[in-house]
Curated annotation (Swiss-Prot):
Binding site for ATP: 169-176
Annotated compartments: Cell inner membrane
Keyword Nucleotide-binding: yes
Source organism, top-level taxon: Bacteria
Name of the featured protein: ATP synthase subunit alpha
Amino acid sequence: MDIRAAEISAILKDQIKNFGQDAEVSEVGQVLSVGDGIARVYGLDNVQAGEMVEFENGTRGMALNLESDNVGIVIFGADREIKEGQTVKRTRAIVDTPVGKGLLGRVVDALGNPIDGKGPIQSDERKRVDVKAPGIIPRKSVHEPMATGLKAIDALIPIGRGQRELIIGDRQTGKTAVALDTILNQKPLNVAGAPESQKLYCVYVAVGQKRSTVAQFVKVLEEQGALEYSIVVAATASDPAPMQYLAPFTGCTMGEYFRDNGMHAVIIYDDLSKQAVAYRQMSLLLRRPPGREAYPGDVFYLHSRLLERSAKLNDSLGAGSLTALPVIETQANDVSAYIPTNVISITDGQIFLETDLFFQGIRPAVNVGLSVSRVGSSAQTKAMKKVAGKIKGELAQYREMAAFAQFGSDLDASTQRLLNRGARLTELLKQPQFSPLKMEEQVVVIWAGTNGYLDALPLNKVRAFEDGLLSLLRGKHVDILNAIRDSRDLSDDNAAKLKSVVDGFVKTFA
């Protein structure tokens, strides 16, 4: 037997080349059946719940149903290329997403991949999309205001940083408009050089909306200069149901990065009704037993585990916060349906938007009687508390009287006065889109309304009065606005100054 030196050296070289490299054993399974975005796979015995798997053609999926003889996998993409008998590979990673400030100004899909054509995401940190919510000890009660810039909301239904406030109403009642105005209102807080404790980053999650609608939303954010402090997560109507199910969790993880690093963020889920429908579709196709309205039994848990992740953290953890504004679409104002009642019971209050009010021209179409904030005035500045307490009572009396006044024609003077004031205050709470007001501006406008300065005006002049008063204050009396902003209070001294300015303005206004 002759020994060939070349052969030996080739074997040695081969062994040296592969030294220290253990054979990579990837656990693989076989597709048993596929259809409707669901694949049944045999052979992935050790797969984890929620683990990402990869099909032959590179399409990703998530293992949801772990059964004794097969695994039910939802597919994040088209199932057309996936055939029976193909192999499926474990990735050994639970579904995660990139997080960090590199995402600001970007539009991503439900897996965190960019879809805005601006190149790869600048982020080296990844987090799991479905994590446990903070417990009781890490939390702190909500006490800082999260201003929306809308008088009707900031005065009557105040939202605090770390709160969950539901926006609920029929289609076309201005739910997204409220959310958009809230994002635009954070622009003055997010100026370059502002302290992180003041800034409020925004995450907008679009679920099951038309692509054109999302594109329009992003365009408005860009034009108004609000995209630079915002992240948009989009799972549109043409995306598969698993993507629509996952998008809110992905957005929440991105928002949690700010919360956990001592910063503040607000996340808008627009809307959770469509996420529930996508989850119902997946559950029924996975053959899980249906419950009320054919939703699966754990649809409450779907929303509660998502919304419980919004919290105000205590000082030892950096005092960060994540505020949630989930949106729910009702059918014919029916708030007693399954998903609306679930989300109402999870959140810390709700803003009801009504079709009737919208068509009467009261926009934002907030039904002040049915809307509530369970955090309440602890999330308001002192100045706003002083002026808003009065307006709440007067509007409540007005609503009660207006119902009776329809029947009687001869009303006594005090009732007439009450109805007059109520009509003017309702007019005062109207606000056009894209024109959010700062806290101090809202305070002076509401102060003028509750102190009777509008009572003698015709209804159609209220808007002009408000604009005129604000431009006068912004121009010649900016010191009053600055004093209210800095002290967050309306001191007697400032109230006296404001009174003399408004008295003077009323005389010239005609």
